[in-house]
């Protein structure tokens, strides 16, 4: 994009090759539109629209409804947490339910989100086979990084035979 615009600028300054300059500006315009689309998709991935528009309970209700196994969801928050905490809670649940559906052979999952003092607690438990581990390049490792980014903690308990529980504690002020 920058190279195309730089070349177009040079050609305009020299006054030569108007057709080529128009083509370069057109290419730069197309690249800019693609970049904007990519950024919008990235932002949605960071903070989904339903989360921003309707809050954590509605966003997670939608996630639970799409999960291939039954999910018992309880969100007990007296007020909306700060946006980074809300987004982190959302991604903890979505990653956990993805893992439950893919790996656990569970018949059901339970999600509990509550406020305990200055912390939002997110707990996802399944009745599957257990044995889950955090792998260095896996989704849970990335999730642990996301939780640490808001100064939270993430713990996994998954004994062989189950159940598996993922617990995130996310600070959100007093």
Residue ranges and their predicted role:
Residues 1-174:
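Coiled-coil dimerization/phosphotransfer module
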């Amino acid at each position: 994009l920058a190279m195309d615009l730089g070349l177009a600028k040079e050609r305009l300054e020299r006054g030569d090759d108007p057709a080529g300059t128009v083509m370069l500006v057109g290419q730069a315009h197309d690249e800019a539109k693609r970049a904007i689309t990519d950024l919008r998709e990235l932002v949605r991935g960071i903070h989904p629209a339903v989360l921003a528009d309707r809050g954590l309970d509605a966003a997670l209700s939608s996630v639970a409804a799409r999960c291939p196994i039954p999910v018992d969801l309880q969100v007990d928050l007296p007020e909306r947490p700060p946006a980074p905490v809300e987004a982190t809670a959302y991604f903890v649940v979505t990653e956990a339910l993805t893992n439950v559906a893919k790996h656990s052979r569970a018949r059901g999952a339970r999600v509990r989100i509550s406020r305990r003092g200055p912390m939002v607690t997110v707990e996802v438990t399944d009745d599957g086979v257990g044995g889950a581990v955090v792998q260095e390049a896996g989704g849970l490792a990335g999730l642990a990084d996301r939780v640490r980014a808001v100064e939270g903690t993430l713990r996994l308990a998954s004994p062989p035979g189950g159940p598996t529980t993922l617990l995130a504690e996310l600070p959100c002020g007093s």
